[in-house]
Amino acid sequence: MFQRFTSLFFSTPAPPEDSNCPGAFVSEEDEVDGWLIIDLQDSYTAPPDPRASPAPAGRPPPAPSLMDESWFVTPPACFTAEGPGLGPARLQSNPLEDLLIEHPSMSVYVTGSTIVLESGPPSPHPEAALPDQDLSDGELAPARREPRALHHAAAPMPARAVLLEKAGQVRRLQRARQRAERHTLSAKVLQRQNRARES
């Protein structure tokens, strides 16, 4: 299978076609979504491979697989570069891939805490008491909805680890500040400061 493909690149160029020579083995080329589909003619046979062992006399040759019949070829990105300067190829991404990559539940860069909105007692809407005057007889007024309580699912373990680490850093900073305040208010420090001012 790959021998035929590599022979296209590494073999000597074919002589110019004569009227009595058979046509090219590629019968149809279609490009679909960046893929080049090449269908081989049914009558095409691969040239004999000199390294291949001859088949036993009692056995028929193996049937070609489906991959031998057609190829899906796509050029590398360096050959499909677009733009005036033929710069690097712009990769197009699927919007669903972006959702998976940028979804907050998968983010490791969690800052702050999650906000949970609780619904309080319903507040009266001044617009609700007014009749809908600008609607025609056939139109329905849009239903007004109360804001729902927003509950977040538990954060994934890496996000929790980040939050716990930040909480630990805050505790260490608070302890260091408390030690510094105690140090400045200790009796020995005050006596040293008084002696320094007197001299």
Swiss-Prot record:
It is found in: Cytoplasm, Cytosol; Nucleus; Nucleus, PML body; Cytoplasmic vesicle, Autophagosome. GO terms for biological process: autophagosome assembly; macroautophagy; negative regulation of protein localization; osteoblast differentiation; positive regulation of DNA-templated transcription; protein localization; tissue homeostasis; ubiquitin-dependent protein catabolic process. Abundantly expressed in skeletal muscle and heart and expression is highly repressed in muscle from obese diabetic rats. The modification Phosphoserine is found at S136. Its main location: cytoplasm. The keyword Cytoplasm applies. Keywords: Activator, Autophagy, Cytoplasm, Cytoplasmic vesicle, Nucleus, Phosphoprotein, Transcription, Transcription regulation. Residues 41-69, 117-153, 173-199 are annotated as: Disordered. PANTHER family: DIABETES AND OBESITY REGULATED, ISOFORM G (PTHR31671), TUMOR PROTEIN P53-INDUCIBLE NUCLEAR PROTEIN 2 (PTHR31671:SF2). The LC3 interacting region (LIR) motif mediates interaction with GABARAP, GABARAPL1, GABARAPL2, MAP1LC3A, MAP1LC3B and MAP1LC3C. Interacts with VMP1, GABARAP, GABARAPL1, GABARAPL2, MAP1LC3A, MAP1LC3B, MAP1LC3C and THRA. Dual regulator of transcription and autophagy. Positively regulates autophagy and is required for autophagosome formation and processing. May act as a scaffold protein that recruits MAP1LC3A, GABARAP and GABARAPL2 and brings them to the autophagosome membrane by interacting with VMP1 where, in cooperation with the BECN1-PI3-kinase class III complex, they trigger autophagosome development. Acts as a transcriptional activator of THRA. This is Tumor protein p53-inducible nuclear protein 2.
